[in-house]
């Protein structure tokens, strides 16, 4: 028969489990506005029962808290990253297409290619055809031709500026990708260090997922996490995981605590 203190111990385990649940709930409420925070839940199970060799069998031994885990769906994370990559791509295209639209704007009255071209080929040419010897018509035609030349030169300058802006944007994005990759690799090492002890590094995992969210705005990402098996026992997981991030059709960006930096290389040919 268990002692009277055994009942007190059962109550004590209940207090500990309830305290863990209350602390987790408080943490969830406190971080309701925290970007990237994942709601956490407490996993509990009944403690191993005590055999008391009585007719009723075993006596319950209370409750124990197994873990505090994030509530996160990897499937929806993957779908979000896929859609986020498309959103980032089209946002960037829209931004530069709107710039190009301003350069090609044509109101048909005073500005734009059609207006300038019509002045040359309709107004100027018709006047010259009517009176080929007219100095005024010739001068007017040359003036319209000069205006069209200036339009093309100005357009070329504007397009070159857009091209330089895009190249600079690419360089900045590459630097941002490298920065994120370095942070993810560092977090991978920190997470494994903690989780090797059997504790879930929930906050660090949230930070890592938030970085992948940012990365997915720039480039397509594929994330895979697999448990690391004990080298001496293939049936035992160590608690650590191999976290891999691939981009651009399967190129490895981050593999555990290592990452491969990207580099911008100028194109030498336009063929």
Please state what every model-predicted region is.
Residues 2-13, 19-82, 86, 92, ...:
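Phosphate-proximal small/polar/acidic motifs at interfaces that engage nucleotide phosphates
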Residues 4, 8-33, 82-104, 110-128, ...:
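Amphipathic, non-membrane alpha-helical segments that mediate helix-helix packing
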């Amino acid at each position: 028969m268990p002692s009277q203190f055994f009942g007190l111990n059962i109550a004590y385990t209940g207090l500990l489990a309830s305290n863990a649940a209350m602390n987790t709930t408080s943490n969830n409420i406190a971080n309701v506005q925290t970007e990237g925070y994942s709601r956490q839940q407490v996993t509990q199970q009944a403690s191993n029962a005590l055999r008391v060799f009585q007719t009723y069998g075993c006596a319950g031994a209370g409750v124990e808290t197994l873990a505090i885990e994030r509530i996160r769906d990897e499937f929806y994370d993957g779908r979000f990253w896929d859609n986020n990559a498309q959103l980032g791509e089209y946002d960037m295209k829209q931004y530069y297409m709107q710039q190009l639209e301003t350069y090609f704007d044509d109101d048909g009255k005073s500005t734009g290619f059609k207006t300038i071209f019509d002045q040359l080929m309709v107004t100027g040419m018709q006047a010259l055809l009517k009176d080929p010897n007219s100095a005024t018509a010739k001068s007017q035609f040359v003036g319209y031709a000069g205006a069209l030349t200036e339009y093309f030169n100005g357009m070329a300058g504007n397009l070159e500026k857009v091209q330089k802006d895009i190249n600079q944007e690419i360089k900045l994005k590459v630097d941002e990708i490298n920065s994120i990759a370095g942070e993810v690799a560092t977090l991978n090492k920190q997470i494994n260090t903690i989780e090797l002890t059997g504790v879930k590094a929930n906050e660090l995992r949230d930070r890592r997922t938030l970085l992948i969210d940012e990365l997915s705005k720039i480039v397509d990402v594929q994330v895979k996490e697999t448990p690391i098996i004990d080298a001496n026992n293939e049936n035992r997981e160590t608690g650590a995981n191999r976290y891999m991030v691939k981009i651009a059709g399967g190129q490895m960006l981050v593999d555990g605590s290592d990452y491969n930096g990207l580099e911008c290389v100028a194109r030498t040919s336009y063929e």
